[in-house]
Amino acid sequence: MTEKPEIWTIRKVLDWTRGYLAEKGVENARLETEWLLSAALGLDRVGLYVNFDKPLNPEELAACRGLVARRAKREPLQYILGTQEFCGLDFVVTPSVLIPRHDTEVIVEEALRRAPHAAAVLDIGVGSGCIAVALAKQLPHAQVVGVEQSPGAIALAQRNAERHGARVTLFEGSLFEPLGDQRFDLIVSNPPYIPTADLEALQPEVREYEPRAALDGGSDGLDFYRLIVPAAPEYLNPGGWLMVELGIGQAETVLGMFSRTGFCDCFTAQDPNGIDRVVGGRIG
Ligand SMILES: C[S@@+](CC[C@H](N)C(=O)[O-])C[C@H]1O[C@@H](n2cnc3c(N)ncnc32)[C@H](O)[C@@H]1O
């Protein structure tokens, strides 16, 4: 007598994967399982539920296994699925770029609120292009420029700008170096700001997969503010704004840098968790 082959229905794969990913330390294992299996099977999440009792064929099972194995090694879901939503737009993401965070939407909101008529905008450290593209979409008459040192990130930012029909001019280089005598009404930046010693304690998704050059802000995390804040006035038109994203506990020190550099109307803005996430100021 031959044994009956085991039948893996969608329900059974979902249940097994949810437990497996939770065991591997994945938060939100239930939701992530649904996204992974949806991607592997080419279904939306409702499609999974209405096909609960459908047995999977060997190819479908192999596709599920491949994606689940990657997530079990703590590769970020966004790199596996290839996209992340930001400001209502879908961005292609690869390991060349930091995955856009929802907290970063605060700098976009502040920029649009305080500088709605900016005609020339600069984003330093453009990464996936999320801030630059979101601003270009909301300020269609503005010239938006992005600077980035990573060639892989520049290529992806270009792809994301084209995907959304956003006019963003990209320069490869460090900070203000590629800009010559251009001047801006608004400069935004989400620079690397994690203190070097804290990198090892980050979640494996961040520590092992996201680009270190997007995270490491030097010994106290403030290296990039020390470079950007004093240099910015030379690249701002009169009345122009500088706004930077920052990490927990950095606002007071960065505000001090703004005041000492001569910025006025300085402000801090909080993320949805009440953490000071953005500092900004205007040049007189
Ligand atoms: C924290 S990530 C932000 C990416 C994107 N703007 C976002 O908000 O998701 C910082 C970015 O700055 C880039 N970067 C690091 N050093 C740089 C430098 N000296 N000049 C320009 N870009 C730099 C990194 O490659 C990375 O893409």
Curated annotation (Swiss-Prot):
S-adenosyl-L-methionine binds at G125, V126, G127, S128, G129, E148, N190. Pfam families: MTS, PrmC_N. It catalyses: L-glutaminyl-[peptide chain release factor] + S-adenosyl-L-methionine = N(5)-methyl-L-glutaminyl-[peptide chain release factor] + S-adenosyl-L-homocysteine + H(+). One of its GO terms (molecular function) is protein-glutamine N-methyltransferase activity. It comes from the Bacteria. Keywords: Methyltransferase, S-adenosyl-L-methionine, Transferase. Substrate binds at N190, P191, P192, Y193. GO terms for biological process: methylation; translational termination. Its EC number is 2.1.1.297. InterPro entries: DNA_methylase_N6_adenine_CS, HemK-like, N5-glutamine_MTase, PrmC_N, RF_methyltr_PrmC, SAM-dependent_MTases_sf, Small_mtfrase_dom. Methylates the class 1 translation termination release factors RF1/PrfA and RF2/PrfB on the glutamine residue of the universally conserved GGQ motif. Belongs to the protein N5-glutamine methyltransferase family. PrmC subfamily. This is Release factor glutamine methyltransferase.
